[in-house]
Amino acid sequence: TRYRAITWGGPPCYWLQFPNWLYNCWGILMIAGMDLFSGNVIIDTTDEETILDGIARNYETGVMRRHLTGGWRHPVEFWDEAEKFHCDMVILHDDITCKGALGLTGVILDQAKERTTKLMVVSNDMFDHRTISRADIRQQVNDYMYSVMQAEPLDASLLQYDDYEGW
């Protein structure tokens, strides 16, 4: 393992092997993804009122809800998580179809300038591989790793390959 990273934002649903590729090609160990930071939610089931209150609070503080419309604290939350896990970088999945996340990208880029943890922004279309393909995503990562991290791949044969028709 060369690098430790967490991901934030909606990853492409059409490339579940992204963490495997990161590790095998570049030595980036994906410690955790955004959805793992929800914690264990315990809802009081004493009566209907407490159940509804618990469900409402869970929705109010759920990761995707905070990610899209959360308060001022949310945009810095992943920096705290990256620090807890001793990460070298945060990989921000910049889903081009998510207006909430697009609005935060500028704020997050400004925050990254003040941090030692690197920020890799990877654009994707969560549900449509024709818009931004797996090859496009690989190229974004490759460009970042070469230019920002000044790194060489562990396995150059994995930099690009034809998987356009792959599921």
Short names for language-model regions:
Residues T1-Y3, W21:
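Hard-cation-handling environments
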Residues R4-T7, G27-D44, T50, Q139, ...:
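Domain-level signal for soluble alpha/beta catalytic cores
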Residues T7-P12, D94-D95:
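Structural motif
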Residues P11-W79:
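Redox- and metal-dependent alpha/beta enzyme cores, enriched for Fe-S-associated oxidoreductases
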Residues C13, H67-W72, C98-L102, D128-T131:
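Acidic-and-aromatic substrate-binding clefts and catalytic sites of carbohydrate-active enzymes
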Residues N58-W79, E83-H86, V148-W167:
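Extended, charge-rich low-complexity interaction segments
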Residues W72-T116, M120:
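C-terminal hydrophobic structural anchor segments
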Residues G106-W167:
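Peripheral docking tails and interdomain loops at the edges
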